UniProtKB/Swiss-Prot annotation, chain B:
Residues spanning the membrane: 30-50, 91-111, 128-148, 193-213, 214-234
Family designation: Belongs to the ATPase A chain family.
UniProt xrefs under Pfam families: ATP-synt_A (PF00119)
Function text: Key component of the proton channel; it plays a direct role in the translocation of protons across the membrane.
Main location: membrane
The name this protein goes by in its record: ATP synthase subunit a
Assembly, per entry: F-type ATPases have 2 components, CF(1) - the catalytic core - and CF(0) - the membrane proton channel. CF(1) has five subunits: alpha(3), beta(3), gamma(1), delta(1), epsilon(1). CF(0) has four main subunits: a, b, b' and c.
Taxon lineage: Bacteria, Bacillati, Cyanobacteriota, Cyanophyceae, Synechococcales
Length: 153, 241
């Protein structure tokens, strides 16, 4: 009796296939359309809109970040060039002042040398003059002595 | 003796009894439609409540529904592929929701308390008609998907790596709906029977872990059914090179 009920008697049974099948199929197809318009479409719209929003924002942020990085690199190179420029100017000024110092030193040295030379020449000429005079006086004196000696004799 | 009492208990479970509705010449299993209408009604109410006020910052029910949508999309996308999953997502999702709601509704709601003149209320998926209907819809879908996407080239699939595959691939077209329908039917019916028998034999405590196991199987079966349906459709639309 039980086995009869279990495996499909004419009336009832587990494997009793009838018009329930096509009607259930129609019901599921209808449910698909209903759920599509009630659930899948609206929720999908909201979720996809949000996903688009988020991905757009991420792209925008990435662009901004890369722009910032580019600007940073720009600034860095600018800073670098400014630094080298400053260094160049400083070294130029140092060279300049060095040159000026050397020139002034040379000039002063030359001047000192010249005046030293002049003084030496003057000293020499005066020495010579003095010597000349001295020798002349000696000559005079000797002549006088000679003359006096000659006269006394 | 024991066997006899077991048999009477089985008989008390009213296995294979149906509440017949006669409309003209056709006969329907009324209990299947009654439970499915109640469960689908609840599902639709739940969904319309959740989608009533959609916001960009999801709250409450909308959050849950979005999670569900995302879950179904992932399922469809991984099985069917990026190109056509959008067309089939509602169908796969409906299969998943229908099977899931039917299984869980059948297991969670104490239908036994409602007395019918004949048969008893239970999971709509524990009726072979429902599962065969679902499985045939899946078969139609993958044929339609293959033919609409690839035209007559769809039949290249039957001789795909070699023509030797032809008989096996044709056989597959029959075994697919068969295995789909009987897997779901068998699992859900077996779960109902096990719980029913245990409740009769030991009404306290012991059936509870089995009931939890039943809920687990029910969810897994819904996932398996939807995944396989999506996989068959994906197989049909896949391009061979």
């Amino acid at each position: 009796m039980l086995a009869f009920n279990f495996f499909g008697a004419t009336e009832g049974g587990l494997f009793d296939i009838n018009a329930t099948l096509p009607l259930m199929a129609i019901q599921v197809v209808a449910l698909t359309y209903i759920l599509n318009s009630l659930f899948f479409k609206p929720v999908g719209n909201v979720v996809e809109k949000r996903e688009k929003f988020v991905s757009n924002n991420i792209i925008e942020a990435k662009n901004k970040l890369s722009e910032v990085k580019k600007l940073e690199a720009d600034l860095l190179t600018q800073l670098q060039s400014a630094r080298t420029e400053a260094q160049r100017i400083v070294s130029e000024a140092e060279n300049e002042s060095d040159k000026l110092y050397k020139e002034a030193l040379d000039l002063a040295n030359n001047e000192a040398n010249a005046s030293k030379e002049k003084a030496r020449l003057e000293i020499e000429s005066q020495t010579n003059a003095a010597r000349d005079q001295l020798s002349k006086q000696a000559d005079d004196l000797s002549e006088l002595i000679v003359n006096r000696l000659i006269l006394e004799k | 003796m024991f066997f006899n009492s077991l048999l009477t208990n089985f008989a008390a479970l009213e296995v294979g009894q149906h509440l017949y509705w006669q409309i003209g010449n056709i006969r329907l299993h009324g209990q299947v439609f009654l439970t499915s209408w109640i469960l689908l009604g609840a599902l639709l109410v739940f969904i319309s409540l959740g989608t009533k006020k959609m916001e960009n910052d999801p709250k409450g029910l909308q959050n849950l529904l979005e999670f569900l949508w995302d879950y179904i999309r992932d399922l469809a996308r991984t099985q069917i592929g990026e190109k056509v999953y959008r067309d089939w997502m509602p169908f796969i999702g409906t299969l998943f929701l229908f099977v899931f709601v039917s299984n869980w509704g059948g297991a969670l709601i104490p239908w036994r308390l409602i007395k019918l003149p004949s048969g008893e209320l239970g999971a709509p998926t524990a009726d072979i008609n429902t599962t065969i209907a679902l499985a045939l819809l899946v078969s139609l879908s993958y044929f339609y998907a293959g033919l609409s996407n690839k035209g007559w080239r769809y039949f290249e699939y039957y001789v795909h790596p070699t023509p030797i595959m032809l008989p096996f691939k044709i056989l597959e077209d029959f075994t697919k709906p068969l295995s789909l329908s009987f897997r779901l039917f068998g699992n859900i019916l077996a779960d109902e029977l096990v719980v029913g028998v245990l409740v009769f034999l030991v009404p306290l405590i012991l059936p509870i872990p089995v009931m939890f196991l039943g809920l687990f199987t029910s969810a897994i079966q819904a996932l398996i059914f939807a995944t396989l349906a999506a996989y068959y459709i994906g197989e049909a639309v896949e391009e061979h090179h």
